[in-house]
Amino acid sequence: MGGESSTGLTTRQADMLILSQPNSNVRYHLLTPMPNGNFVPQSLVIRFELEPHCKDGDLPVIHPSEEILLLEQGQLDVLVESETTRLNAGDTTVVQSNLPHIVSNPGDTTAVGLAVFTPAIWFPNNRRSFNRGGET
């Protein structure tokens, strides 16, 4: 017990992948193991950190997965199509699949939470930016 997992189903904190883009104000910690020859996760769980007074991108994003957001710390504004929902620590919301959305942090502290994508999407290939002129 407590030893290393030989199945690749356990992700240790020291081995977690952290994704961010240059000049980005958000970091994604992949909590779900990456797909391998023996296992392809059906859901993707990430921990996100979004800096104060920032958003997760310039354009809304659209993807084929349902996204469940659980905010642990700070505040988030979740804009889905034209409706904004304010989340405070402990709140959750669901973004239905294929709806354009963008997340912003209106607060003075870093927003930290979990996002669950079902079915799993593997960055960056399945994330598509969306603008009113169509998908890009």
What are these regions (language model features)?
Residues 56-63, 104-106:
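Short histidine-centered beta-strand/loop micro-motifs
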Residues 106, 111-136:
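Double-stranded beta-helix
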Residues 99-102:
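Short, charged beta-turn/beta-strand-edge "cap" motif at the junction between a beta-strand
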Residues 17-59, 116, 121:
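A short glycine-rich, His/Asp/Glu-containing loop-to-beta-strand
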Residues 2-27, 132:
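Short, charged recognition helix plus adjacent turn
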Residues 47-51, 61-78:
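Short, conserved beta-strand element in jelly-roll/cupin
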Residues 81-97:
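Short acidic-glycine-tyrosine-enriched beta hairpin
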